[in-house]
């Protein structure tokens, strides 16, 4: 993915209206980079490409990709101590494919498969 250009802001500099993000006091959908606790890129007011979110401690909280404002592909989430909590897969914002959840000690808690946002095999 090439550089989308635009400016660099924090999420606090943006407002969301009907699923589209705008820089405060403007009517133009935001295109540019977001820095701070949550980091990634907006294209035409929607999250696009790789995003990361950090706990206030600076440890990684969540990482994955967005496509046209929707979670898409593999996502991982972590607890405040940095322990992996889940591996999830999305397609167009819906749960799709394998999901795995872990206990605080790293042991497997649960796993399953999703299709069209619904868990299969239940």
Predicted regions and their residues:
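Glycine/tyrosine- and acidic-biased, solvent-exposed loop/turn segments at the edges of beta-strands
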Residues: 1-122
């Amino acid at each position: 993915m090439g550089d989308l250009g635009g400016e660099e802001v924090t999420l606090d500099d943006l407002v969301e209206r009907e699923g589209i993000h705008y820089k405060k006091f403007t009517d133009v959908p935001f295109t540019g980079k977001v820095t701070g606790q949550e980091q990634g890129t907006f294209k035409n007011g929607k999250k696009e490409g790789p995003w990361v979110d950090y706990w206030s401690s600076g440890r990684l909280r969540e990482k994955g990709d967005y496509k046209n404002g929707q979670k898409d592909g593999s996502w991982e989430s972590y607890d405040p101590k940095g322990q992996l909590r889940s591996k999830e897969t999305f397609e167009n914002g819906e749960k799709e494919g394998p999901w795995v959840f872990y206990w605080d000690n790293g042991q497997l808690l649960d796993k399953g498969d999703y299709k069209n946002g619904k868990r299969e095999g239940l």
